[in-house]
Structure formats: structure tokens, C-alpha cells
């Protein structure tokens, strides 16, 4: 490998902003925020969706998609 061209791979804490769930993983992503996790200080990366809040992993289905073309067509012609 060439020197000084690869990003630094280090442990970071990812935090699900929806649920507050935190987990430690390796990443090259940079952050100015830090958090104490299991007695150590790590960079903090905030994510909107993780395995703790995603409907596929939680088993809870919720529809957040806005009306699409098919829905508008069905409403316009009273098909549903």
C-alpha cells in the first residue's frame, strides 16, 4: 500500500438519533463530536436510521413515503 493516501481507520461510536441507541464500529468517517462509551472517548457519528430503528429489523412497519404517481392515479379515478 502507498503511504499517506489512505484515510485513517479507527473505532467510532454511531448513535441512532431516533432511538438514542449507540454502538461501536470501525470507520474512516471524521467527526468533531466525541462521546464516552464503555469508559473510552470516541468520535461520535449521528445516523438517522440504524438496525435499532429500521422497520425491517424491528418488525414494525411504518409508511413514510408520500403519495406517489400510482396513489394519485388511484385517488383520481377512485380505484382504491
Swiss-Prot record:
Domain of life: Bacteria
GO molecular function: structural constituent of ribosome
Cellular component terms (Gene Ontology): ribonucleoprotein complex; ribosome
InterPro entries: Ribosomal_bL28/bL31-like_sf, Ribosomal_bL31, Ribosomal_bL31_B, Ribosomal_bL31_sf
UniProt GO BP: translation
Keyword Ribonucleoprotein appears in the UniProt entry: yes
Keywords from the UniProt entry: Ribonucleoprotein, Ribosomal protein
Record-linked NCBIfam families: L31, PRK01678.1
Subunit (UniProt): Part of the 50S ribosomal subunit.
Record family assignment: Belongs to the bacterial ribosomal protein bL31 family. Type B subfamily.
Name by which UniProt lists this protein: Large ribosomal subunit protein bL31B
Organism encoding this protein: Streptococcus pneumoniae serotype 4 (strain ATCC BAA-334 / TIGR4)
Amino acid at each position: 500500500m502507498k503511504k499517506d493516501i489512505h484515510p485513517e481507520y479507527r473505532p467510532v461510536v454511531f448513535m441512532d438519533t431516533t432511538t438514542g441507541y449507540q454502538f461501536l464500529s470501525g470507520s474512516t468517517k471524521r467527526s468533531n463530536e466525541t462521546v464516552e462509551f464503555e469508559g473510552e472517548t470516541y468520535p461520535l457519528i449521528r445516523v438517522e436510521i440504524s438496525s435499532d430503528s429500521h422497520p425491517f429489523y424491528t418488525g414494525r412497519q411504518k409508511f413514510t413515503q408520500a403519495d406517489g404517481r400510482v396513489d394519485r392515479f388511484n385517488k383520481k379515478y377512485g380505484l382504491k
